[in-house]
Amino acid sequence: MPAETRDWYDTPLQYDIIFDADTPREADFLEAMWVEHGPSGPPGRVLEPACGSGRLVLEMARRGWSAAGFDGNASMLEFARGRLAAAGMGALLWQDRMESFRVPGRARFDLAHCLVSTFKYLLTEDHAVSCLRRVASVLKPGGIFVLGLHLTEYGRATPDHERWVAERGGIHVTCNTRTWPADPRARLEAVRTRLRVRQGGREHLQETRWHFRTYSAAELHRLLRQVPELRLAACHDFTYDAAAPLRLDGSHLDAVLVLRRR
C-alpha cells in the first residue's frame, strides 16, 4: 500500500491514540519531580511548550494544576481545546513556537515540561538556547522544567526502529518510526514515521519525514552551560522511575532532565 505524505501533527486523533497510554505515568513522574525538586506547596501553574493534542494539559488540570500550553500546529490545538471542553476543564492554550513564545499576560509558572524529544525539533543552537531562556524567564524562582529527549549514538551505522500499537473506539493505529544514523557535523538525524490506521474495515497509511537536532551527553551539558538561569537538579530516563536518578554521562541513550530555576 503506498503511503500518503502527510504531517502526522495534522492528524491529532491518530497521534493521540498512540501516545495517550503513557499520560498518567508521565503526570505521576512530573508531580514526583515537583515534590522532590520544586518549592513546597500544593499544585500551582504548569506550562507545556509544544503541548500537542493536550493529553498532559488535561491530565494536569484534572490533578488540580492551573494548566497552560502552546503548540505550533493549529490542528493539534483545535483537538486539545475540544478534549478540554468535553471534559469540562479549562486551560490557557495558544499557538506559538518554542524558540520565540510569549506567554499571554504576566503569568509565571511553578512547573514546565516538554517530553518525548520535542525539543529536538529546534534545529539550531540559537533556537535551543532561546527556548531554554524563555522557559526560565516564565518560571518562578525554584520552579522546575522537566525536559525529555533521546540522546544520539553517533557511532551507530544502521537505522534505529521503534514500533507502537494502540486502539481506541474501533480505530487501530500502528506507528513505525525509523531514525537514520546522525550526521555529526550538521548535528542532524533524519526521521520517518509511518502511521497505519485501520477503522471499519478500511486501512490507510501515511508517512511523515523530518530532521531532529542531535545531542550527546557532552553536547547537552554544553547547551545547559549557556543558560545559567537553569541548574541541572536531576536526570532520569524514559522509564519515569522517580526513585532511580541517573548521571548525564553518556551511559544511557535517553535523558529526562530536571532543570531548576535559580
Model regions and ranges:
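A short glycine-rich, Lys/Arg-flanked "PGG" loop and its adjoining helix->strand segment in the class I
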Residues: 129-141
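Conserved SAM-binding strand-loop segment of SAM-dependent methyltransferases
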Residues: 86-100
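Conserved class I S-adenosyl-L-methionine
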Residues: 1-44
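Conserved beta-strand signature within the Rossmann-like core of class I S-adenosyl-L-methionine
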Residues: 142-149
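Conserved SAM-binding loop of SAM-dependent methyltransferases across substrates and taxa
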Residues: 53-65
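SAM-dependent methyltransferase
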Residues: 149-222
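Conserved SAM/SAH-binding beta-strand->alpha-helix loop
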Residues: 73-75
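A short acidic, Gly/Pro-enriched loop at the edge of an enzyme's catalytic core
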Residues: 103-111
